[in-house]
């Protein structure tokens, strides 16, 4: 199973279209972690399972998404309602409550990934307004490949190229 995660494009339609066009057919699902600032009816949003972010005023997206793909339970939130700037504990509790195998979030504009008690926690970073150590990449998103043994996480830059230093493999055991 392969899932693509993107977040915080803040109205940048072009980058979402490029990502969708490039990876359509290569991934099983595309998840958007919020702050798209685009209407759900916008054609560019159609490939993405999207949640509402703190700057998505008046847009009709859910607060959470739970997608089941090839027996993997993928939970997506924006993060602002779960204090992800300070701790992952509320998100971890929500992930366990939903029996998620992957919990993805945005909001911080900084990529992050870790595996805790068999659950992968992933922030794809902001595709349009990155912050922190990897800001120089101009934006990031991630593709997670999952099999029975491991989570394989590859981050990509804004030019849709894999970032060699941002490839992580986590055992599911």
Report each predicted region and the residues it spans.
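Active-site environment of divalent metal-dependent phosphoester hydrolases
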Residues: 10-15, 36-41, 55-60, 82-87, ...
């Amino acid at each position: 199973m392969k899932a693509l995660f993107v977040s915080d494009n803040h109205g940048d339609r072009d980058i979402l279209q490029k990502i969708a066009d490039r990876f359509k057919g290569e991934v099983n699902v595309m998840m958007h972690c919020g702050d798209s600032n685009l209407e759900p009816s916008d054609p560019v949003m159609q490939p993405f399972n999207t949640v509402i972010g703190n700057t998505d005023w008046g847009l009709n997206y859910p607060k959470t998404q739970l997608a089941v793909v090839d027996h993997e339970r993928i939970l997506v939130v924006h993060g602002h309602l779960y204090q992800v700037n300070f701790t992952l504990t509320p998100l971890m509790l929500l992930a366990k409550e939903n029996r998620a195998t992957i919990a993805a979030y945005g909001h911080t504009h900084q990529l992050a990934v870790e595996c805790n008690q068999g659950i992968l926690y992933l922030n794809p970073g902001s595709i349009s307004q990155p912050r922190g150590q990897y800001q120089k990449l101009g934006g990031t998103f991630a593709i997670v490949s999952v099999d029975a043994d491991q989570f394989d996480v590859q981050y990509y830059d804004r030019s849709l190229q894999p970032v060699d230093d941002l490839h992580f493999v986590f055992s599911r055991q």
